[in-house]
Amino acid sequence: RYGTDAATHAPEWISRSAGSASDVRFEALLRRLDDRTPDPKIRLTRRRVVVDGRMMEEFTLVSHLEEEVGLVLEVAVTPDATPMQEVKSGARPAAAVERTLAGDAVELTAGAASMRLRAPGGEVTASGDDLVLTWHVTCPPRAAATVSWHVDLDDPSLVVRGTARQVDWALQARGGDPRLNRWLRQALDDLDALRLTLPGSPDEFFAAGAPWFFTLFGRDSLWAARLFLSVDPGMAASTLRVLGRLQ
């Protein structure tokens, strides 16, 4: 939410675009701050990036007004440490999350799992079950201003991990329909985001059982690796090594 005084307003979200399976942008208008002309001159871009163990959001205010713009930007975050089996069953969230606030950061713990949230340049406060991240933003005339927050997660009980290996899978579809190449790029990007490893081993496999399990299923992971042989035979080899060590 945003505002220039005690009252805050919700942005008017108008579009979404995905740069990858792990990177998405949302565009919004802030009409309460704009001038009276029909064409919007102030936009807010919200970019969300997810990598192994971290989620980051970046808010960029872009102004084409002739005067300086000042506003308060608020983001409400609701910590939730409910185990997946309870989410799957539809049970009410019951996992207690302990919070330790410290200026622009907060430490969150739930059993052995922990999270550290930071909002550089802002302030983190508690409001009921929510955390409210607040920034006082000043955007110069015809310029941009950016604030961000991120959360780092650590859970030693997880039986799978992400992978740090970068891949450059590329395929060119045959045919004249441009939608086919777009679909192919999306499919490869989704598969990239599905790569997992087991703790202490670099060998990768494709996650299966989404969304409730999202882990190693020998049959499903082998099928996926087999269908992917023409793109990256290394995925089949590493999947076999993973399964071999578990025999």
Model regions: which residues?
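Extracellular/luminal low-complexity Ser/Thr/Pro-rich, glycosylation-prone repeat/linker regions
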Residues: 1, 9-11, 35-38, 156-159, ...
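Acidic-aromatic substrate-binding/catalytic surfaces of carbohydrate-active enzymes
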Residues: 1-27
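Short, Φ-rich (hydrophobic/aromatic) sequence segments
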Residues: 1-4, 191, 226
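A generic structural motif
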Residues: 3, 29-31, 62, 109
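Glycine-centered tight beta-turn/hairpin loop motif at sheet-sheet or coil-to-beta transitions
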Residues: 6-8, 39-43, 112
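Low-complexity, acidic Ser/Thr/Pro/Gly-rich terminal tails and inter-domain linkers that flank the onset
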Residues: 20-53
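Acidic/polar, glycine-enriched structural segments that form the non-catalytic walls/loops
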Residues: 43, 51-56, 63-216, 237, ...
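Alpha-helical support elements that line or immediately flank enzyme active sites
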Residues: 220-247
